[in-house]
């Protein structure tokens, strides 16, 4: 919460839900909370970049310890995976990341992912965990990405949750209210930005809450939050990586003939 206290009931619920999902899904958990729980140990915390890095370094082991505690009754080991933006922008590093996660899944280990705030380059940081989760989902060719939010879903102008969105268009974008979480960096604008990216690459996205007893199961059956339908995509894995994980370093201008050849995949 805003005072830096981790809600054990939420962690317990997340662990229980994921334990059930593992029967049919390979799961990656991207978890916030490190900075929020670690800032209690930073005197006169003001939220500067250096203080956030220090708070994350203190909070990450606390968070992992709790996940270990609540996954333990299900005999499920967890792994801490601290990522940086270059792990996705570098194709070779990304492929190594995929191999490691494949090893996790083969051994029934749940990877718990967060940004490596302590050493992350300021210019190449993730904008927030919404971006990190989206890059994970796209890079690992996920079927579904569930993004949790305190408001329980994507709301219209009357603060009513919209249960189904077929496409993120100008009408949907018009409902976005600016503002960020008091605990993290992301807000609904960020969530919708990365939802649009994920759905454009063929991934179903659900923005939902954690208030029900079985929030993930409810989300997957359309009973919790807002479901954003995936758009048709014929892109191969490398093309999806180029569309999401790679970083633009420059531009090339081509003439009409070259453009036609590229569009025809020649």
Regions found by a protein language model. Give the residues of each.
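C-terminal catalytic "cap/lid" subdomain
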Residues: 1-77, 81-266
């Amino acid at each position: 919460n805003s005072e830096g206290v981790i809600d054990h009931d939420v962690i317990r619920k997340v662990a229980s839900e994921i334990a059930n999902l593992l029967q049919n899904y390979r799961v990656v958990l991207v978890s916030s909370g490190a900075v929020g729980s670690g800032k209690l140990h930073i005197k006169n915390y003001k939220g500067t970049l250096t203080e956030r890095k220090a708070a994350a370094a203190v909070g990450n082991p606390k968070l992992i310890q709790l996940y270990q505690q609540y996954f333990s009754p299900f005999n499920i080991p967890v792994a801490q995976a601290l990522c940086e933006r270059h792990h996705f922008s570098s194709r070779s590093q990304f492929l190594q990341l995929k191999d490691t996660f494949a090893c996790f899944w083969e051994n029934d280990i749940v990877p718990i992912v967060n940004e490596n705030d302590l050493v992350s380059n300021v210019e190449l940081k993730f904008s927030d965990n919404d971006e990190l989760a989206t890059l994970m989902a796209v890079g690992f060719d996920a079927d579904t990405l569930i993004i949790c939010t305190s408001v329980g879903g994507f709301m219209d102008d009357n603060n009513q949750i919209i249960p189904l969105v077929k496409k993120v268009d100008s009408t949907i974008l018009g409902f976005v209210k600016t503002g960020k979480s008091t605990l993290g960096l992301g807000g609904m604008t960020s969530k919708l930005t990365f939802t649009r990216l994920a759905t454009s690459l063929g991934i179903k996205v659900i923005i939902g809450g954690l208030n029900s007893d079985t929030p993930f199961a409810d989300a997957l059956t359309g009973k919790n939050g807002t479901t954003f339908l995936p758009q048709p995509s014929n892109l191969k894995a490398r093309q999806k990586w180029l569309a999401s994980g790679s970083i633009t370093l420059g531009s090339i201008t081509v003439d009409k003939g070259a453009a036609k050849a590229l569009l025809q995949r020649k």
